Amino acid sequence: MTRSVALATCSQMPSGDDDSRLLDAALQADGIEASWRVWNDPDADWSRFDLVIVRSTWDYTVDRGAFIDWTRRVPRLANPTDVIAWNTDKTYLRDVSDAGIEVVPTAWIEPGRAVELPGGEFVVKPSVGASSNGAGRFDSAAAGQLDAARVHAGMLHDAGRTVMVQPYLADVDTAGETALSYFDGKFSHAVRKGAMLPQSTAYGLASGLSTSLSLPERITPRQPDAAELRLGDQVLDLIRDRFGGELLYARIDVLPTPDGPVVIELELTEPSLFLEHDAAAAGQFAAAVSNRLA
């Protein structure tokens, strides 16, 4: 019997993202019929698929509530609705920190609260946002940057967003982020992601409420070190304890610091998985999907 899956995407990318070609081929090789569907297409019949896999739904930030409502209507969804509802607001980092896992230090400023800014270089961004949309990098020592950061935070507050303020970790400019990818709770591969915010500029000020999907990323394969893998294992243990079982897919982004790596973000909803940077990755993803359909 033919097994069928839908790969959910957004209207700007109806055929999927950069992972789509390799993923389509790997699923087909495993005897799985895959088709791309726009998540908010009113004519899509999600019930006819054995599984719906969230992939490049990168416009969900325009109306997160509608997106969460959609996940609740899909009969068989990966990752599950409760995971997606938790993961699509970066306040989940509070839970990660409360579990004793190292994360980037973050101040949370809800609408209506005064905006207090740190010294040095820092980042201001919304708690709900995809890629670097809405993020700004500022330097308190540069003329006008503190005022620009307050304006940026105010714009996000006016849109009803909770603001995150984090120190800018300079090691990302040289070492980059490490993105750890997992399928069914097993480590698959990692890549290096270059810094995405220009130095001492308010990128997010002009585009804080932009619906553009992403900035160009500089991606290269990377072998993670033991400390990064241990940090990833800690996060997976938290996810298992919180939600039960393994997730079909997960990406954990970590940053270097002088005291060891810290978590910057958990991508459990619609991550780029950079399948082209590891020869076995697409096959491992397809095998994990096949196991779910067995």
Task: State what each model feature region is.
Residues 58, 132, 196-199, 267-277:
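Glycine-rich phosphate/pyrophosphate-binding beta-alpha loops
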Residues 45-50, 117-120, 174, 256-262:
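A short, glycine/Asx- and small/polar-enriched loop/turn
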Residues 2-9, 71-75, 82-175, 229-230:
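Active-site nucleotide/adenylate-binding loops and adjacent lid/helix of ATP-dependent enzymes
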Residues 4, 10-110:
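Conserved N-proximal alpha/beta basic substrate-recognition cap immediately N-terminal to
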Residues 145-242, 262:
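Phosphate-binding site of ATP-dependent enzymes
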